């Protein structure tokens, strides 16, 4: 009696996670593939004068500009052609699923080494002990208010922080107690087993383009390869750039 080998059915990849930088950040303007120039919108204390005083024509606050460059993200997939799996589709869906991580890691660390501002250029506000996230968030928001003189600020946290923030009502939807947006991203690094770092920055912009996928079938060894690539950019107003560490119990 002959036996028939049943073919498995390839499952569809789940949709990329919602939220994160790509779900919350402001859309980068057209032409972002040439790079973005972000003026330091908030870095300038307003001058209070009597309205009858004649002002001098000398600007007190000179505009500073930060430059952010685009970068590439790539993923790949390979398998025997005998598997009959769509490697081109696999590579593209893998790219879609991991783009958020790549964009967030670039914002946090300038992992590509482009010289763009990142969280690592921020100013430390110290360490808060015993999981006191209320004090940590309050300290961050006050620092942002003082540095930006009223300009918008955005709060950032790794996934590990989300449960702590939600329990203390510091993550209402995606808003802080003052109404600033939170970005909780899978790509933000955790500092250690007992330390969670939170950041605050100026406004954030991000964009990615559609994937470009290359597929190659090596018939000599039946190897099916696919490479998915896309361009991305992430930028923020670095006038506000602070971080604070919070100590927590070690995970099991």
Language model regions located:
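Flexible, glycine/threonine- and acidic-rich loop/arm segments that mediate assembly and lattice contacts
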Residues: 1-126, 163, 168, 225-252
């Amino acid at each position: 009696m002959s036996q028939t080998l049943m073919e498995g059915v390839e499952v569809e990849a789940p949709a990329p996670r919602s939220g994160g930088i790509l779900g919350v950040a402001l859309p980068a303007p057209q032409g972002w593939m040439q790079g973005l120039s972000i003026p330091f919108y908030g870095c300038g204390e307003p001058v209070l004068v009597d309205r009858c005083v004649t002002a001098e024509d000398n600007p007190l606050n000179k505009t500073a500009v930060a430059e952010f460059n685009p970068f590439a993200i790539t993923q790949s997939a390979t398998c025997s052609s005998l598997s009959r799996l769509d490697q081109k589709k696999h590579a593209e869906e893998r790219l879609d699923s991991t783009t958020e991580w790549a964009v967030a890691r670039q914002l946090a660390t300038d992992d590509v080494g482009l010289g763009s501002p990142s969280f690592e250029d921020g100013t430390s506000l110290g360490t808060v002990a015993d999981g006191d996230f209320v004090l940590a968030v309050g300290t961050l928001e006050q620092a942002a208010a003082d540095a930006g003189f009223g300009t918008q600020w955005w709060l950032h946290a790794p996934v590990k922080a989300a449960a702590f923030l939600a329990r203390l009502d510091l993550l209402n939807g995606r808003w802080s107690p003052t109404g600033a947006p939170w970005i909780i991203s899978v790509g933000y690094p955790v500092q250690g087993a007992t330390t969670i770092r939170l950041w605050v920055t100026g406004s954030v912009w991000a964009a990615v383009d559609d994937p470009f996928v290359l597929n190659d079938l090596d018939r000599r060894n039946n190897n099916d390869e696919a490479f998915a690539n896309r361009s991305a950019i992430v930028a923020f107003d670095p006038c506000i750039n602070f971080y604070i560490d919070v100590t927590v119990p070690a995970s099991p």
